[in-house]
Regions:
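Short, Lys/Arg-rich flexible segments
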Residues: 1-84, 92, 98-143
Length: 143
């Protein structure tokens, strides 16, 4: 059987070893970059649907929009890093921001649905991936 030895350049091997040591910090920065893109789109969609298309004057306090944000980067039980776009809790009146967002997204028997999360997810998927790729390239380039 034939035998082959592949010699990697020392600089490449050094960068790979540094990458391994900084995986968590790089993953945080990459996910943060993608999360910011998604957050901006969700925020703009939310502003567009809140108070629009109502038969009566809007009673929006702006609290739902202000509570929208990004979670810190977390590591799940399988070792995967993730970040979430969501609402901080609770509201000043004691109700749940997630409940209000769910009512807006899916509607009720008396209120028409005004989706803002699902359209944002569909619209920014490619942009998020591109932002994450460029953040990754930048971080790897700094090694």
């Amino acid at each position: 059987m034939a035998k082959a030895d592949v010699k990697m350049p020392d600089e490449f091997l050094a960068r790979i070893s540094r990458l391994g040591a900084q995986t968590d910090s790089i993953a945080e920065k990459v996910l943060q970059a993608g999360g910011e893109v998604a957050l901006a789109k969700v925020r703009s969609n939310l502003k567009a649907v809140v108070g629009s298309g109502n038969k009566s004057e809007s009673r929006s306090t702006g609290e739902l929009e202000r509570s929208l944000g990004l979670s810190p980067v977390m590591v799940d039980k399988n070792g995967n890093h993730d970040i979430k776009v969501g609402f901080s809790e609770p509201r000043s009146d004691g109700s749940s921001n997630a409940k209000i967002a769910n009512i807006l997204e899916y509607g009720t028997s008396t209120q028409q649905a005004k989706p803002f999360l699902k359209p944002a997810k569909s619209a920014v998927k490619k942009q998020c991936v591109d932002a994450m790729k460029s953040a990754f390239e930048k971080e790897v380039g700094n090694l």
